């Protein structure tokens, strides 16, 4: 028997109800983000065409995302992305999700940066701190001679950081190290 085609409005309702039942605090917002993530539909498009049919494949993907979020998996681990300092960063279960309050640290670091300085980001995770400092210094202050090192004990975290560096076009030396064990003295 063929499954009934669901509309954007119906899918969103299914998502909000399920997340609310499971005690997700921002159930409405999370259901919306996941709908947008899966379908690519903007809020303007949603409100213009709430009865637009959603493909069976996208409906299944959305329901799977809702199930994962209902199991309290962080939204960013489901979408694989978190914005930090205005840049998109890949994230997964091997790294901490970049937090907006950490942006203050980056903003303060940028204020003290001078040409030819080196930045060491210990326990780098996604690399968001070192990458944001270097990228913003390049774009805002034209400091292209800065060097960055991102160190982490986890090779899985370093894979994420390398991908973020590649996506942002920022060269950083990535080192697998338990704190300072393999950090060169300079």
What are these regions (language model features)?
Residues 2-54, 58, 62:
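A short N-terminal interaction module
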Residues 6, 29, 57, 97-100, ...:
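Residues at secondary-structure transition points
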Residues 19-23, 39, 70, 113, ...:
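Secondary-structure transition/hinge residues
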Residues 23, 27, 42-43, 74, ...:
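Secondary-structure boundary/capping signal
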Residues 33, 82, 176-178:
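A general secondary-structure junction signal
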Residues 36-111:
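Conserved AdoMet
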Residues 103-186:
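Conserved SAM/SAH cofactor-binding pocket of Class I
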């Amino acid at each position: 028997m063929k499954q009934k085609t669901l509309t954007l409005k119906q899918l969103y309702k299914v998502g909000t109800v399920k997340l609310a039942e499971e005690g997700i605090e921002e159930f409405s917002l999370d259901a919306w983000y996941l709908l947008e993530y899966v379908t690519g539909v903007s809020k303007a498009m949603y409100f213009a065409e709430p009865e637009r049919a959603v493909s069976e494949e996208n409906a299944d993907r959305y329901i799977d995302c809702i199930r994962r979020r209902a199991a309290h998996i962080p939204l960013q681990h489901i979408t694989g992305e978190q914005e930090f300092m205005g840049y998109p960063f890949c994230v997964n279960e091997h790294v901490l999700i970049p937090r907006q309050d950490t942006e203050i640290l980056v903003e303060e670091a940028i204020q003290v940066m001078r040409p030819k300085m080196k930045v060491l980001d210990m326990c780098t995770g996604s690399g968001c701190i070192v990458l944001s400092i270097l990228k913003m210094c390049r774009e805002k202050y034209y400091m292209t001679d800065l060097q960055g090192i991102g160190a982490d004990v986890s090779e899985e975290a370093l894979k994420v950081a390398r991908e973020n560096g590649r996506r942002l076009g920022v060269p950083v030396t990535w080192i697998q190290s338990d704190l300072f064990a393999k950090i060169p003295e300079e």
